[in-house]
Amino acid sequence: NLDAVIRKYCVSLIPPTSGTRFLPNDFNKITTVEGVLFANSWVRPKYQPTGAIHMRRPDLWQQYLDRIMPQEEDCWWTQSDESKVTHRQQDYFEAFIAQRLQRPQEPCTVAMILGGEQGTGKSFWADVMMRQIIGRTNYKAVSLSDVKGSFNADLFETVLLHIEEINDQRGKVTEILKPYVTPDEQRFNAKYKAQAQAQVRKHFGLVLSSNHQNPILIEATDRRYFVPAFSKHQSHQGE
């Protein structure tokens, strides 16, 4: 009886699910969310931590950091008690990367804006390095028009979302980006699905890159953005 064989060896081994959810660092292929079974669309990266502790940056990495943000540049923010906290931009940049690697399941509530002259390598760390480390399916490079689009479900299935070549100084752009930065949850629209709208938990960190000095308008008191120094060629564009 083929039906009995299928029921015993197939259906019982692959439980029915109500759809998919993107759940980084959940190593179960089938997982439960609020009592409902979902298939986890997150793909575990090939590269895993070794446990080794390095007390200093590799020379090539330090050279790269010096290109996109000089060592002497600081960043700062004010806390709820109005006290000011200062860090080196390179240190904060690495902390942003570390948070994406070590705790991708936790939402990142600060967006990074990397500005620089064309060809300075400001996108190399994301397009080449991070894509390999976090997994190709966990990184997405998009344009601002993709974010403005009606169907944005796929943008939430990522650990690092990179909006490339942004340059739009209209005030409404920051309002469009706001839901992609701070909230833990956001409503998404899926194309060609029965449940086109759903509430989803945001896991990605947001990065914007641009060749322009002021790619978007940000209020002086807005603490949602990390804006390091504008990178320039150290000698000439051909270097």
Role assignments for model-derived ranges:
Residues N1-G51:
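Intein modules and their embedded homing endonuclease domains
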Residues K29-L160, F226:
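P-loop NTPase catalytic core of nucleic-acid-dependent motor ATPases
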Residues A111, D168, A194-A198:
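Conserved nucleotide-state-sensing and coupling region of NTP-binding domains
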Residues I134, T174-A198:
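Conserved catalytic/switch belt of AAA+ P-loop NTPases
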Residues F151-F156, A190-S209:
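AAA+/SF3 P-loop NTPase mechanochemical coupling elements
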Residues T158-P183, P215-D222:
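Conserved AAA+/SF3 P-loop NTPase catalytic/coupling segment centered on the Walker-B
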Residues I216-S235:
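A short helix-turn-beta junction within AAA+ P-loop NTPase domains corresponding to the substrate/partner-engaging
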